[in-house]
Amino acid sequence: MIIHPKVRGFICTTTHPLGCERNVLEQIAATRARGVRTDGPKKVLVIGASSGYGLASRITAAFGFGADTLGVFFEKPGTASKAGTAGWYNSAAFDKHAKAAGLYSKSINGDAFSDAAREKVIELIKTEMGGQVDLMVYSLASPVRKLPGSGEVKRSALKPIGQTYTATAIDTNKDTIIQASIEPASAQEIEDTVTVMGGQDWELWIDALEGAGVLADGARSVAFSYIGTEITWPIYWHGALGKAKVDLDHTAQRLNARLARRGGGANVAVLKSVVTQASAAIPVMPLYISMVYKIMKEKGLHEGTIEQLDRLFRERLYREDGQPAQVDDENRLRLDDWELRDDVQDACKALWPQVTTENLFELTDYAGYKHEFLKLFGFERTDVDYDADVATDVSFDCIELG
């Protein structure tokens, strides 16, 4: 079928399979250009492997270090009459090109919060991956979590704590500057956000993997976080989501103590703000990203997801000099270091009050934001003919969990 973008709110409801594949190929090429190292992870499990930072982790492990990878995600496959989600096509493309490079690649499509997913992962590690993994990446960004056992569904809330938060934002449907107000989260919403977005599920995964004996000696685990700056703190770090990320930090400290006994470790990696399906949903982030992209591009500091993950693997987790990674006071790996430079943040703060609907495209990189957003779904690529027919029913080596 012929597919063009249709945007509703912060979601693009259509996806382009070929565009998604080209996006993945672009990330593979960027990784290969930095050379393949053999002194890093060999068997890698990625939870939340189909888009954003999780996908970039999988690409970096496979094409930067020659690792075998197992990816878990929750995506909608395409059919002959309807396109699937971008993550489905991203994962299909990854699988195709990893196999072409002679690498083991297997995927599981299902609820990563479920015990069934853990059981299937353990089975595959034992039967197909030599029995153990040496790196587990935790990269889930889900608004909903069904609790294993009880089946109770919890939802996260992107809300401030204590008082209503009002700030300048972009109405991305109309490309206008608005004042957005968000009511504060209730105590229950805060608790539920911690349950969905905190470290509980990460710990359940490590419990299961360790209990089954499928974590190698020296195995590492990393989970992703974002802290940001005072511009976004009310909605993020000081909001309900921030409480979940603090819980993630506490979890990392517990897991690190456990894995360190066998020569491994666990860290939270704090990454920079990028255009992903997850960040597009957070109020104020599109405007902040549009500003920070412009400033960082001007300073030659801009990075996308693949550049961030490349730096995380090569300069932090698996340093060529064999030294332990540099961490902050909370034992976190900081990849937001360039974004948080004073010269970058001071420029952002100076720019923020000046932005209006009239000068939005001129003062910020909102055009770049819109381009990157549509690109997530396979659109806006110059190497794809969007008026040509494209097959939407794409299958690959993926186990469907019922």
Curated annotation (Swiss-Prot):
The keyword Ribonucleoprotein does not apply. NAD(+) binds at residues 48-53, 74-75, 111-112, 140-141, 245, 274-276. One of its GO terms (biological process) is fatty acid biosynthetic process. Keywords: Fatty acid biosynthesis, Fatty acid metabolism, Lipid biosynthesis, Lipid metabolism, NAD, Oxidoreductase. One of its GO terms (molecular function) is NAD binding. Transmembrane segments: none annotated. The active site is at Y236 (proton donor). The keyword NAD applies. It catalyses: a 2,3-saturated acyl-[ACP] + NAD(+) = a (2E)-enoyl-[ACP] + NADH + H(+). Its EC number is 1.3.1.9. Substrate binds at Y226. It comes from the Bacteria. Pathway: Lipid metabolism; fatty acid biosynthesis. The record marks E75 as: Plays an important role in discriminating NADH against NADPH. Involved in the final reduction of the elongation cycle of fatty acid synthesis (FAS II). Catalyzes the reduction of a carbon-carbon double bond in an enoyl moiety that is covalently linked to an acyl carrier protein (ACP). Belongs to the TER reductase family. Monomer. NCBIfam families: EnoyACPredFabV, PRK13656.1. This is Enoyl-[acyl-carrier-protein] reductase [NADH]. It comes from Xanthomonas axonopodis pv. citri (strain 306). The lineage of its organism: Bacteria, Pseudomonadati, Pseudomonadota, Gammaproteobacteria, Lysobacterales. The gene is fabV.
